[in-house]
């Protein structure tokens, strides 16, 4: 990855790519009674878990989010998924940095910063996710900033359409709507635009600027649900209203409670639709997840975040999970914030993949 997207401090957290991609150990461990017995509706290999570790920060300007996959893995997440929840892990033990896809010069295009790098990397991610999803595996992607969801959702949408002839639904858990178009964005950071490209509200003909996105990569706005919103740009509010997109803000959660919100969210999607869960850790209140690039006070508790993940798992419809925007380099020296944010991220993933309290 070019120096413009990663600094030396962030690189210290990232495992150096191995010269050969060593396969992950695929033998499942014991579940010790901790894994939910929910039967998957849409996965032919529900105990097989495809892992994509994405060390990429080019969708925004703060270095360090590319260090998250290594921090999550070093904290024992993959070992927990294998030995405690009984998954067979597929993929490799490399955190992908995609340095070969990041051009030396990447001037803005239509107000987008690093457009070629983000387009190139998300196209590769789409291919990686698709390679797992087409085999009927559940796919877990560890980011990385939220621009990577252009790739993860495109890959799972394409695979599900090919394998089952169905469209996916997306539950987007985030403080932000990330549905700016290049023209409505105030910052030009693409991590605030992925949903507009995934729904076709923003598009490009040129391959180097997301022109690789085709109809089979895209998501219907009718199958999109937001949870946890509390920092939404004026242009995004207009987009949400004009397109009738289902969105539950923190006001809705305060008013109805997270249990009722999840009932309404899942009722909107329906029980016959594969679900891709994309979870930005900044959906949590900074009390629980301070080490993230755009924290916003007044967010979800960790227990509410875990509950969202548990509810999605209990549907039996989950086909893919993203965890994004953990930034372990933002904490001050001797600050426990990075550790707590990584712990929170691991908890969210485990709950989405079936960890139960009893």
Swiss-Prot record:
Binding site for Mn(2+) 1: 146, 174, 178, 280
Catalytic reaction(s) noted: L-arginine + H2O = urea + L-ornithine
Keywords, sorted A to Z: Arginine metabolism, Cytoplasm, Hydrolase, Manganese, Metal-binding
Cofactor notes: Binds 2 manganese ions per subunit.
Presence of keyword Hydrolase: yes
Gene3D superfamilies: Ureohydrolase domain
Record SUPFAM superfamilies: Arginase/deacetylase (SSF52768)
GO molecular function: arginase activity; manganese ion binding
Chief subcellular location: cytoplasm
Entry-linked InterPro entries: Arginase, Ureohydrolase, Ureohydrolase_dom_sf, Ureohydrolase_Mn_BS
Necessary cofactors: Mn(2+)
Enzyme Commission numbers on file: 3.5.3.1
Pfam families from the UniProt entry: Arginase
Positions that bind Mn(2+) 2: 174, 176, 280, 282
Location within or outside the cell: Cytoplasm
Pathway: Nitrogen metabolism; urea cycle; L-ornithine and urea from L-arginine: step 1/1
UniProt-annotated binding residues for substrate: 176-180, 187-189, 233, 294, 325
GO BP annotation list: arginine catabolic process to ornithine; urea cycle
GO cellular component, as recorded: cytoplasm; cytosol
Record family assignment: Belongs to the arginase family.
NCBIfam families listed in its UniProt record: rocF_arginase (TIGR01229)
Protein name (Swiss-Prot/TrEMBL): Arginase
């Amino acid at each position: 990855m070019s120096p413009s997207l990663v600094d030396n401090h962030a690189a210290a957290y990232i495992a150096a790519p191995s010269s050969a991609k060593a396969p992950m150990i695929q033998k499942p461990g014991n579940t010790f009674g901790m894994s939910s017995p929910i039967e998957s509706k849409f996965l032919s290999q529900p105990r097989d878990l495809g892992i994509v570790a994405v060390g990429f920060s080019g969708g925004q300007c703060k270095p360090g989010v590319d260090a998250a996959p290594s921090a999550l893995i070093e904290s024992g997440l993959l070992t927990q998924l294998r030995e405690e929840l009984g998954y067979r892990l597929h993929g490799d033990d490399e955190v992908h940095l995609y340095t070969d896809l990041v051009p030396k010069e990447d001037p803005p295009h239509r107000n987008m910063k690093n457009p070629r790098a983000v387009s190139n990397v998300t196209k590769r991610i789409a291919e990686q996710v698709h390679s797992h999803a087409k085999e009927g595996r559940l796919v877990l992607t560890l980011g990385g900033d939220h621009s990577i969801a252009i790739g993860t959702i495109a890959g799972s949408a394409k695979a599900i359409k090919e394998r089952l002839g169905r469209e996916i639904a997306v539950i987007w858990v985030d403080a932000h709507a990330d549905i700016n178009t290049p023209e409505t964005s105030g910052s030009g950071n693409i991590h605030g635009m992925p949903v507009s490209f995934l729904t076709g509200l923003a598009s490009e003909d040129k391959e180097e600027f997301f022109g690789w996105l085709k109809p089979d990569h895209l998501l219907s706005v009718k199958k999109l649900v937001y949870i946890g919103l509390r920092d939404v740009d004026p242009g995004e509010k207009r987009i949400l209203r004009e397109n009738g997109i289902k969105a539950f803000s923190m006001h809705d959660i305060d008013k109805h409670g997270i249990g009722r919100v999840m009932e309404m969210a899942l009722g909107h999607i329906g029980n016959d639709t594969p679900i891709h869960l994309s979870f930005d850790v900044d959906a949590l209140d900074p009390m629980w997840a301070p080490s993230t690039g755009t924290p916003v006070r007044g967010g979800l508790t960790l227990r509410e975040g875990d509950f969202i993940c548990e509810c999605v798992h209990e549907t039996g419809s989950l086909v893919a999970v993203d965890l994004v925007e953990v930034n372990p380099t933002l904490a001050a020296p001797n600050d426990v914030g990075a550790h707590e944010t990584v712990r929170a991220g691991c908890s969210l993933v485990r709950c989405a993949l079936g960890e139960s309290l009893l």
